[in-house]
A protein has these predicted regions:
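A short beta-strand-loop-beta hairpin characteristic of the jelly-roll/cupin
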Residues: 1, 79-106
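Ligand-binding loop in jelly-roll beta-barrel domains
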Residues: 1-20, 114-140
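Tight coil/turn sites that cap or link beta-strands
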Residues: 5, 70-71, 107, 113-115
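Short strand-coil-strand connectors
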Residues: 5, 23, 98-100
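A short, N-terminal "cap"/entry segment at the start of jelly-roll beta-barrel domains
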Residues: 7-61
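A short glycine-rich, His/Asp/Glu-containing loop-to-beta-strand
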Residues: 38-77, 83, 133-136
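Well-ordered beta-strand positions in beta-sheet-rich domains
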Residues: 65, 101-103, 117
Length: 142
């Protein structure tokens, strides 16, 4: 049962679980994002990361929340071998994707293919926050 004191948004991600040989099934994860610590990311005071799913080989997906203070950014342009996506929760920013900067804001969704260069810069006057997911702990079919 899920209850909310006010308006709520449900984000549903459907993904078939990929078992790993000799690894038991993961335990269900239920919680509230507000109860997950926001740890400083890469020693950058204005960048915080909340890890929503345990970093354990039993889980085949990572789901995290990044929060950036205005003016802070990912310090690198990165690529990943796996596809992944993000849902923008609050604030505004510029997202760099495949050689193009685009403005993003709350309720925007971005799907990123494998090996696509990407980065993020928080704009506006309030913190920017996004939920992202990616496949982890399994071989990526190439």
């Amino acid at each position: 049962e899920v209850r909310a004191d006010g308006a709520a948004t449900l984000i549903l991600l459907r993904k078939r679980y990929e078992p790993a040989a000799g690894v038991p099934l993961p335990a269900p994860v239920v919680g509230n994002e507000a109860d997950v610590p926001a740890d400083m990311w890469m020693d950058i005071e204005g960048a915080r990361l909340q890890t929503l799913i345990p970093d354990d080989v039993a889980y085949d997906i990572a789901m995290n929340v990044f929060t950036f203070a205005p003016g802070y950014s990912l310090p690198i342009v990165e690529t990943h071998v796996m596809e992944h996506g993000l849902y923008f929760l609050q604030g505004k920013g510029l997202y760099y994707l495949d050689e193009e900067w685009m403005e993003v804001e709350a309720t925007d969704f971005i799907w990123m293919g494998p090996f696509v260069p990407q980065s993020f810069y928080a704009t506006g006057t309030t913190p920017s926050k996004y939920l992202y997911y990616k496949n982890v702990n399994r071989e990526i079919p190439l």
